[in-house]
């Protein structure tokens, strides 16, 4: 599987045109991924009572839960909340929800581990056996895939150069960045700091599909997760999304800035590098046209 991932990445890189953003020095993150392990991380499951009329989900699943709370809803119907090996579980007379936990962590005790499809199958079948539910009828409502990349430099240096992903909203926070839509999210953060490994430059890349049915155009069942063709489709979607991230070729040389003039010059160079010279020139011409600048400013 690792070789398969590697081949897909090299094919993706070979299609880059000269000068394309993803072919800058920061394509090294793509090359580093050859040495990482793409895996399923957080996966949320749902099973509807109508799909398993032969099973009383509330009665069947409730006894297996830890930290169990038996409640009555506003509709007067009973429901139960509890924990199952790291997962949050909610079950009532209509639906069973199993969510908010890494499938990899459920199986290995950590989400930093190679997770071959055979083990994905064992993990999913294990959930079904423990809770006595048919996993082939369980649907996936959220699906995160992830990869850890060991880098030569601080992950933040890479993240700061990731400028834009078309049709996604970019948000940044102290340890990483995320590109979001209502359906999907591409997230990068410093996994080394999260793990307390300050001496290691480990970046975590996560591809989150928050609306699985809408994204794939069909229901995705738990048993599909370990199907190689489905996994390859997911990899293609991830690589397609990742390859569209626009990155800058250079960052501001903060260690060499010792005055306001140099700062302004560097900021101007950085703007041109990120956006090209044409938008800057067009902006100057517009200001000349509007009388805000003299004609000589554009010469």
Predicted regions and their residues:
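Structured, helix-rich domain cores that form ligand/interaction pockets
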Residues: 1-282, 286, 290
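Helix-turn-helix DNA-binding segment
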Residues: 288, 293-299
């Amino acid at each position: 599987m690792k070789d398969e991932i590697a081949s897909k990445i090299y094919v993706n890189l070979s299609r880059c045109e000269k000068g394309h953003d993803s072919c800058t020095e920061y394509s090294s993150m793509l090359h580093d991924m050859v040495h990482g392990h793409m895996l399923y991380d957080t996966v949320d499951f749902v099973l509807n009572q109508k799909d398993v009329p032969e099973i009383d989900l509330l009665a069947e699943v409730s006894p297996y839960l830890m930290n169990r709370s038996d409640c009555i809803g506003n509709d007067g119907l009973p429901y139960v909340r509890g924990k199952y090996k790291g997962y949050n579980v909610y079950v009532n007379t209509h639906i069973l929800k199993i969510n908010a936990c890494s499938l990899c962590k459920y199986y290995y005790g950590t989400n930093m581990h190679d997770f071959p499809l055979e083990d994905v199958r064992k993990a999913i079948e294990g959930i079904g056996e423990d809770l006595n539910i048919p996993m082939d009828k369980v649907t996936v409502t959220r699906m995160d895939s992830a990869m850890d990349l060991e880098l030569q430099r601080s992950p933040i240096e890479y993240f700061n150069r990731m400028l834009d992903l078309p049709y996604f909203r970019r948000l940044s926070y102290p340890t990483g960045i995320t590109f979001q839509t209502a359906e999907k999210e591409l997230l990068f953060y410093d996994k080394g700091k999260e793990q307390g490994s300050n001496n290691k430059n480990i970046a975590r890349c996560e591809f989150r599909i928050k609306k699985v049915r809408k994204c794939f155009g069909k229901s995705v069942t738990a048993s599909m997760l370990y199907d190689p063709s489905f996994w390859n489709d997911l990899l293609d979607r991830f690589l397609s999304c990742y390859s569209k991230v626009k990155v800058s070729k250079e960052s501001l040389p903060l260690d060499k800035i010792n005055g306001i003039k140099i700062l302004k010059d560097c900021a101007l160079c950085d703007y041109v590098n990120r956006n090209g010279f044409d938008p800057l020139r067009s902006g100057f011409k517009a200001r000349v046209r509007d009388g805000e600048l003299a004609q000589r400013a554009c010469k």
